[in-house]
């Protein structure tokens, strides 16, 4: 069977591979398009596995909220370079992962990867195809899904690198967005004092006590100094204690109280946080992309 230019074009569109690779696959499969796709997927998986150990610390945060605002999902999908993170293929893949995360009942990344992204292909299979096509390691690092019976889920994305989900009871959509925006900017550790681990407070109290005692002041004064510093510390790390970014004269707690609302929980993702990125200069990064193409 002769291999036509149209067949090669269609295979290129479906696989994102080069013209010669597509023509070779079609020749090897006797012009069977589906068999050629399968062959190239197998070849792509082999290439993908070689790249799967490389550090992927760039990427984007994507979020999806249900139409009724009762559920939402947020995901972090990583790649190796900012260049790839801005590409249409990667953007679509990351957004599709968020859609799968919202629709599925997956509890772990492994379960999410095993979920169906399109007919006949799991998230992980599509991920591996992306690796073969783009030439960089791609990793679905983490996700969270929130649902609310009594309130709503608000979301906020600061560009593509920071994302927040907030479960809010009371208030309106605008308040939810404002609170999510505040969390993106101020990075609170938890909602309120109840969420601060006891060991964290104990450690800070020990440090503040040592500092206060070094002042040589009486014990009762030292105790008040420590209490004051602990209060300030809690105000800095808890959502309700922080000055609201759009109106620093009031705390987030006071704002919520004035609106008759409360925050049940929140999730904040930032691209690459906690990942040790390999140092690569610009020239080396360009050369790496050229070699992979």
Curated annotation (Swiss-Prot):
CDD domains: UBA_EF-Ts. The keyword Hydrolase does not apply. Residues 81-84 are annotated as: Involved in Mg(2+) ion dislocation from EF-Tu. Keywords: Cytoplasm, Elongation factor, Protein biosynthesis. It is found in: Cytoplasm. Coiled coil: none annotated. Its main location: cytoplasm. GO terms for cellular component: cytoplasm. It comes from the Bacteria. One of its GO terms (molecular function) is translation elongation factor activity. NCBIfam families: tsf (TIGR00116). HAMAP family: EF_Ts. Belongs to the EF-Ts family. PANTHER family: ELONGATION FACTOR TS (PTHR11741), ELONGATION FACTOR TS, MITOCHONDRIAL (PTHR11741:SF0). Associates with the EF-Tu.GDP complex and induces the exchange of GDP to GTP. It remains bound to the aminoacyl-tRNA.EF-Tu.GTP complex up to the GTP hydrolysis stage on the ribosome. This is Elongation factor Ts. The gene is tsf.
